[in-house]
Amino acid sequence: MAYATAEDVVTLWAKEPEPEVMALIERRLQQIERMIKRRIPDLDVKAAASATFRADLIDIEADAVLRLVRNPEGYLSETDGAYTYQLQADLSQGKLTILDEEWEILGVNSQKRMAVIVPNVVMPT
């Protein structure tokens, strides 16, 4: 069971969704919970130990689901005259995503890494 509820998502959305959208929100909340638990196996322990962590977790789950529900097709921009639209590449697949800064709030390091290889030159003697 997700920490965030459909009501948390609806509160952030500030509009009353259709009943089928509420069912979608519930389903997506379960998915986002599993996604987080794969990266943070002791999620329940952390949420029980810290009210701040739990509040952040609820906000992050609700925000991630809201991003998808609010814009399921992933539109980045849309024009009316001689109709054009542009899809946002990372949202056009209808996938749930948690942003890097949200992972950092939850205490998970970003998966983007940079390494520098420094050669150790040994001069011949």
Curated annotation (Swiss-Prot):
Q: Which InterPro entries does the annotation name?
A: Mycophage_D29_Gp19
Q: Which Pfam families does the UniProt entry name for this protein?
A: Phage_Gp19 (PF09355)
Task: Specify the protein name.
Answer: Gene 19 protein
